[in-house]
Regions:
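A short beta-strand-to-loop transition that corresponds to the Sensor-1 phosphate-sensing loop
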Residues: 11, 73-77, 210, 268-271, ...
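Conserved C-terminal RecA-like helicase domain
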Residues: 1-3, 23-24, 30, 142-268
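SF2 helicase catalytic motif II
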Residues: 2-65, 69
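Catalytic P-loop NTPase motifs of RecA-like helicase/translocase cores
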Residues: 15-18, 79-80, 293, 306
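Conserved RecA-like P-loop NTPase helicase motor core
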Residues: 229, 233-348
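Short mixed-charge
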Residues: 36-60, 105-108, 182-186, 228-233, ...
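Interdomain helical connector at the RecA1-RecA2 junction of SF1/SF2 helicase-like NTPases
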Residues: 61, 65, 69, 80-203
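Non-catalytic, charged low-complexity extensions flanking SF2 helicase motor domains
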Residues: 345-372
Length: 372
């Protein structure tokens, strides 16, 4: 029996007992049976309570392979760190902030290895009362994205309000037009109306709460009233028919064709939100609740992958220097930023300094109604 020098578990936030990992284990081994017990509760939703519990079942002692050491890799290891699974000496951090800081500080004559990595910008929007009111719930009347985009079959329960939201993001919401005319160039930049975004956000990922919501959005985008979106190929990456893993990636690239000449919108409630790379994605719209920073930032960082090409002389051209996160629940967005920046940096003890370092490289623009 082979004793390996090291076993590397990538995407550790995602668990070690998924179907792909299990296929490498001896099916007669008790560990395989233990893994099978959790399979039925693994879902598309990377943040669901049951799925998190299933992933926590993993135990090195059950691994049917012998090794001298383990290396766990994750871009969002919040639960592993907060649970005390690893002591401080076992943790090495290289975060988004470190990467962007290294990119800016690069002074060598050698090519900058970080130059391709886009800088992320977050824009949060407090929706007008006339749109938000239908989904204000709870003790503090917080805007509930899951309620707002709730759907059955392929129809939104609040379709009238979702249509208002679509009008808003493309700059044609009538209740805002007079105010925006007064503001002129100071009006909030919406993802599908601001000229700075229109040519840049050719391919976006919309993160919705359910398969039904994805199908409902696809149907709504194809209505004559939304003729603006007819230029975009809409991909529903949700449900069993969308495929799993790499099979869910192929339809997206097929729809893009030559991504510099096409436009796409990918609708998903979990597929393609972790462990995959779709280079032409330049923006993500966060359209679902998420109390888990793992789920939130795994999805957000899907749009931060580098995208380059070669010019006629063979020189590298960076096509994506920036990428964007659009969030319509400002309080939730800021809470996620606070948790991400504070939980990953175990060396710094001052939370304000942790957040300050993070937003130095991830600027956040917050819009309330028609003002920043």
């Amino acid at each position: 029996e082979v004793e390996w020098d090291c076993i590397v578990l990538d995407e550790y936030h995602y668990g070690a007992w998924g179907k792909n990992a299990k296929s490498y284990y001896d099916k007669k081994d008790p560990a395989h049976s233990r893994a099978a017990e959790t399979e039925h509760i693994l879902t598309e939703d990377a943040g669901s309570r049951k799925e998190i519990e299933a992933r926590e079942i993993y135990d090195e002692g059950l691994m049917p392979l012998k090794t001298k050491a383990y290396l766990y890799l994750s871009g969002t290891p919040f639960r592993a760190i907060s649970s005390g699974e690893f002591i401080e000496e076992q943790i090495y951090n290289w975060t988004y902030s470190d990467e962007q800081q290294a990119k800016e500080a690069w002074s060598s004559d050698e090519p900058n290895p970080y130059a391709q990595l886009p800088k992320m910008v977050m824009l949060t929007y407090q929706l007008p009362d006339s749109i938000r009111e239908i989904a204000e719930q709870g003790e503090f009347d917080e805007f509930d994205l899951n309620e707002f985009f709730s759907a059955e079959d392929d129809t939104f329960e609040h379709e009238e309000y979702v249509q208002k939201w679509l009008d808003l993001i493309r700059g044609s919401y009538t209740e805002n037009i007079v105010t925006e005319l007064k503001l002129g160039t100071e009006k909030p930049p919406m993802p599908f109306s601001d000229s700075r975004f229109l040519s840049y956000l050719q391919h976006t990922y919309w993160f919705l709460p359910s398969v039904a919501a994805c199908k409902a959005m696809a149907r709504l985008l194809r209505k004559p009233v939304n003729r603006f979106f007819s230029d975009y190929e809409v991909i529903v990456a949700a449900g069993n028919e969308a495929g799993m893993g790499a099979k869910a990636v192929e339809p997206v690239y097929d729809a893009m064709g030559d991504p510099q000449k096409t436009k796409t919108i990918t609708l998903s409630c979990g597929k393609l939100s972790t462990g995959v790379t779709i280079k032409p994605w330049t923006g993500i719209l966060m359209l679902r609740n998420s109390s888990s920073p793992e789920t939130y930032f795994q999805a957000a960082f899907r749009v931060q992958s580098p995208w380059t090409t070669r010019d006629e002389w063979g020189s590298e051209v960076i096509l994506k220097p920036l990428c964007y996160v659009f969030d319509f629940a400002p309080n939730r967005a800021l809470k996620q930023v606070q948790e991400y920046s504070c939980n990953l940096n175990v060396e710094e003890t001052n939370p304000e300094k942790k957040v300050a370092k993070f937003i130095e490289f991830l600027p956040i623009l917050a819009y309330d109604g028609s003002s920043m």
